[in-house]
């Protein structure tokens, strides 16, 4: 797959953000790797009230799209990805990425619930807990790093 296809098909999903800063950091990282679509699910508190409008501003300025949905199940149902990767410190190796894929990070740095992980596959990005934004950065770099100038 060429870089343009990868940037169109790799979709970061920022799940359950509670902090404005964590939400915006994940959005900025995603935009920095040139992704064309970013999804936010289950935003709560100030992340929902202040972070979402600011995230929309950043995404629109970059020419990308932001989708805000209530839940991960809706994301999988509507976007119909070929694979859903829940990024973490445990799990399987990601392997080769092809087609439309979702990279899901838990923005409140909690563990994913079993009902959430049942929608895809838990993958190990790094064996240490470095936070959700760092996990997203490492996963995007693994897949899109060669596409970024």
Please name every model-derived segment.
Residues 1-149:
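Post-transcriptional modification and biogenesis factors for structured RNAs
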């Amino acid at each position: 797959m060429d870089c343009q296809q990868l940037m169109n098909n790799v979709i970061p999903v920022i799940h359950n953000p509670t902090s404005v800063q964590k939400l915006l950091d994940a959005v900025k990282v995603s935009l920095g790797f040139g992704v064309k679509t970013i999804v936010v699910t289950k935003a709560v508190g100030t992340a929902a009230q202040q972070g979402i409008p600011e995230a929309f501003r950043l995404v629109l300025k970059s020419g990308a799209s932001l989708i805000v949905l209530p839940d991960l199940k809706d994301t999988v149902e509507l976007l119909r990805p070929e694979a859903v990767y829940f990024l973490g410190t445990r799990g399987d190796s990601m392997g080769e990425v092809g087609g439309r894929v979702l990279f899901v990070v838990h923005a409140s740095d909690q563990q994913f619930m079993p009902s959430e992980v049942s929608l895809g596959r838990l993958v190990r990005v790094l064996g240490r807990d470095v936070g959700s934004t760092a996990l997203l950065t490492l996963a995007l770099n693994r897949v899109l790093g060669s596409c970024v100038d």
